[in-house]
């Protein structure tokens, strides 16, 4: 079962990306390094509720 998740920047808090994940394979929160346009650099983005 795939669900949509919102990814927020850990440095500025902006919610920049929407992605999907499989809850059965990844029950924990997703973390990805993505580009943050506010910080103008690649930062860690974490799944939000």
UniProtKB/Swiss-Prot annotation:
PROSITE patterns for this protein: RIBOSOMAL_L33
Database matches in InterPro entries: Ribosomal_bL33, Ribosomal_bL33_CS, Ribosomal_bL33_sf, Ribosomal_zn-bd
Protein encoded by which gene: rpmG1
One protein family per Pfam: Ribosomal_L33
Region (Disordered): 21-49
Family membership: Belongs to the bacterial ribosomal protein bL33 family.
Keywords, alphabetical: Ribonucleoprotein, Ribosomal protein
Name of this chain's protein: Large ribosomal subunit protein bL33A
UniProt GO molecular function: structural constituent of ribosome
Organism whose genome encodes this protein: Staphylococcus epidermidis (strain ATCC 35984 / DSM 28319 / BCRC 17069 / CCUG 31568 / BM 3577 / RP62A)
Recorded GO CC terms: cytoplasm; ribonucleoprotein complex; ribosome
Biological process per Gene Ontology, one example term: translation
Top-level taxon: Bacteria
Positions with biased composition (Basic and acidic residues): 25-49
Disulphide bridges, residue numbers: none
């Amino acid at each position: 079962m795939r669900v949509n998740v919102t990814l927020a920047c850990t440095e500025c808090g902006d919610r920049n990306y929407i992605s999907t994940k499989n809850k059965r394979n990844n029950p924990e929160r997703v973390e990805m390094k993505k580009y943050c346009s506010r910080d103008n650099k690649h930062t860690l983005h974490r799944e939000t509720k």
